[in-house]
Amino acid sequence: MDPNTVSSFQDILMRMSKMQLGSSSEDLNGMITQFESLKLYRDSLGEAVMRMGDLHSLQNRNGKWREQLGQKFEEIRWLIEEVRHRLKITENSFEQITFMQALQLLLEVEQEIRTFSFQLI
């Protein structure tokens, strides 16, 4: 796994956790939780690809891994839309930069998960 991606996740999560968005702080906490969940999923998929023979193990652990993969792509799409929405409504430059970087990271992670999943199929 790319160390820059790991530090990007950690940096964005830390900055998002410091943001105060008023009444929408619950939404932001939900986004942070989904980011963390997505990172863990991407990491586990990447580890399975590195072991390359691990498809059977992955299927045994979770017989519905393709369904789970589809759900993760839905989460990514939702997060992308949510981040885009936040980007449009915020006027704070710190928040704009954070959300732009979060959007870029989400797009990178989506591509990584696609690549990993194609290697596992």
Swiss-Prot record:
Chief site of localization: virion
Short motif Nuclear export signal, span: 12-21, 85-94
GO-annotated biological processes: exit of virus from host cell nucleus through nuclear pore
Subcellular location: Virion; Host nucleus
Pfam families: Flu_NS2
Sorted UniProt keywords: Host nucleus, Host-virus interaction, Transport, Virion
GO cellular component, as recorded: host cell nucleus; virion component
Role: Mediates the nuclear export of encapsidated genomic RNAs (ribonucleoproteins, RNPs). Acts as an adapter between viral RNPs complexes and the nuclear export machinery of the cell. Possesses no intrinsic RNA-binding activity, but includes a C-terminal M1-binding domain. This domain is believed to allow recognition of RNPs bound to the protein M1.
Note: Average number present in a viral particle is estimated to be 130-200 molecules.
Protein family (similarity comment): Belongs to the influenza viruses NEP family.
Subunit field text: Interacts with protein M1. May interact with host nucleoporin RAB/HRB and exportin XPO1/CRM1.
Protein name (record): Nuclear export protein
Organism for this UniProt entry: Influenza A virus (strain A/USA:Iowa/1943 H1N1)
